[in-house]
C-alpha cells in the first residue's frame, strides 16, 4: 500500500523508512531505524529525485507509481551513488525505460561500473552552476564532492528555493509520518542522531585543508 506525502503543490515524498536494519552500512548501530528520502516533481515533465535502498524497494515502487498516476517518468536525478540513494536505480530504469538520467560525469562513470544498463544513451550531464528546466521549475546544480563521496551533487529549485541536499543534512532515524519542521521537536527527537550521523559519515570524509 502506498505511503506518500504531498510536500508542495507539485512535489511529493515517495521514500520509505526501514525499522528492521540493525547496522547502517554494516557498521553504525541504528536502534531507531533509518529513512530513505526520494521525491517526485510533477511539472510539465515528471522528475524523480533519487531512489532508495533495496530493502524498501517494494514500498518505493508503489509510492512512485501512485504519485505518477499513469504519467511516464521523464527524468531521474541522481545526486549520490551510495546504495541508500541509488540501489534501486537499475530497477527504476527497467520499469521506466524512457527516463533520462540527470547526473554529473563522476556519477555517470560510477553507474557504468555499478549497473548493466546503458547510461551513455540516457545521461544528461550537469556541471557546476548548470541549470535544467522541467516546465515551471528550473533546477540549478552544485557539485558537493566528499559530502560524503567524491561524486555528490545537489539540486536547487530556483522556483521554490528548495534544496535537495543529498547527505549534507542527513540523520539516522526512521520517519514516523512527520516530514515538516513544525511537526517534530528536532532537539528532542533528532539532534543526537544528526550529530552522530555527521561525525560518523560526513565529517570523516571532509577534504584535508
Walk through the language-model features, giving the residues of each.
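Residue-level detector of conserved catalytic or cofactor/ligand-binding positions
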Residues: 202-209
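Conserved beta-strand hairpin/beta-sheet module of binuclear metal-dependent hydrolase folds
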Residues: 4-66, 154-157, 162-165
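Short catalytic-loop micro-motif centered on adjacent basic/acidic residues
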Residues: 47-50, 74-78, 140-141
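Active-site environment of divalent metal-dependent phosphoester hydrolases
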Residues: 21, 81-86, 108-111, 148-150, ...
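Metallo-beta-lactamase
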Residues: 5-9, 102-152
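Active-site gating loops and adjacent loop-to-helix segments of metal-dependent hydrolytic enzymes
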Residues: 172-198
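Internal, well-ordered alpha/beta segment that forms a basic, Gly-enriched binding/recognition surface
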Residues: 140-174
Amino acid at each position: 500500500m502506498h505511503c506518500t506525502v504531498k510536500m508542495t503543490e507539485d512535489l511529493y515524498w515517495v521514500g520509505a523508512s526501514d525499522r528492521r536494519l540493525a547496522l547502517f552500512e554494516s557498521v553504525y548501530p541504528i536502534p531507531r531505524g533509518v529513512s530513505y528520502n526520494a521525491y517526485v516533481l510533477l511539472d510539465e515533465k515528471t522528475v524523480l529525485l533519487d531512489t532508495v535502498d533495496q530493502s524498501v524497494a517494494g514500498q518505493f515502487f508503489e509510492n512512485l507509481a501512485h504519485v505518477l498516476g499513469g504519467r511516464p517518468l521523464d527524468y531521474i536525478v541522481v545526486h549520490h551513488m551510495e546504495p541508500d540513494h541509488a540501489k534501486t536505480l537499475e530497477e527504476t530504469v527497467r520499469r521506466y525505460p524512457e527516463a533520462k538520467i540527470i547526473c554529473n560525469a563522476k556519477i555517470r562513470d560510477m553507474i557504468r561500473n555499478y549497473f548493466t544498463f546503458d547510461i551513455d544513451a540516457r545521461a544528461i550531464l550537469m556541471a557546476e552552476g548548470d541549470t535544467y528546466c522541467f516546465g515551471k521549475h528550473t533546477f540549478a546544480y552544485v557539485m558537493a564532492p566528499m559530502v560524503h563521496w567524491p561524486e555528490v551533487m545537489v539540486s536547487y529549485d530556483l522556483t521554490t528555493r528548495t534544496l535537495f541536499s543529498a547527505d549534507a543534512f542527513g540523520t539516522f532515524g526512521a520517519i514516523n509520518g512527520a516530514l515538516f519542521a513544525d511537526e517534530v521537536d528536532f532537539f528532542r527527537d533528532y539532534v543526537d542522531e544528526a550529530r552522530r550521523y555527521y561525525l560518523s559519515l560526513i565529517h570523516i570524509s571532509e577534504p584535508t585543508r
